Amino acid sequence: MCFEELKRRLLEGIDLRQGRLHLAKVSQGRFLEEENYTIHLNGERLLFAKVFYGRKPYYKEWVELFNIEEGFFGTEAEDLLLELFSKCFRRLFVEYYNDLQTTKELKSGIPPQETRLGKKLKSLGYTYFKDWYYPEGWMEGGYKLQAERL
């Protein structure tokens, strides 16, 4: 399963114990290879995803999950979305400021890969982690955890 299958599954919707998860909107990103997803749970916005499909041979694919509702973290929806995106994307960015446990762990000095979110990403095969607690410019967005696998 990869890009088109991932998008198809999300557009069709996925029933969870929490309710129905679905891709409510897809719009063109800044580049030809980039799309913006709006993902809903039970008809309410859950998060946005910036999806970059790569530009071979120069740039690899990545996805960033941001403006995430606090109720997402620690749920079946979080587990499923991270699993689905991890199958297609070797680089994943997850904004964590509404993930109170991960935020607290990072502020106390716990390494990114040992936080609640980091352990979840590590279990999906990611091996490199970076805490973007101080984004370098105005385009990078908020605090996020970067996870990559080779």
Model-derived segments and spans:
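Non-catalytic substrate-recognition and accessory regions of acyl/acetyltransferase enzymes
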Residues: 1-73, 87-150
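A short glycine-leucine-enriched loop at secondary-structure breakpoints
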Residues: 72-80
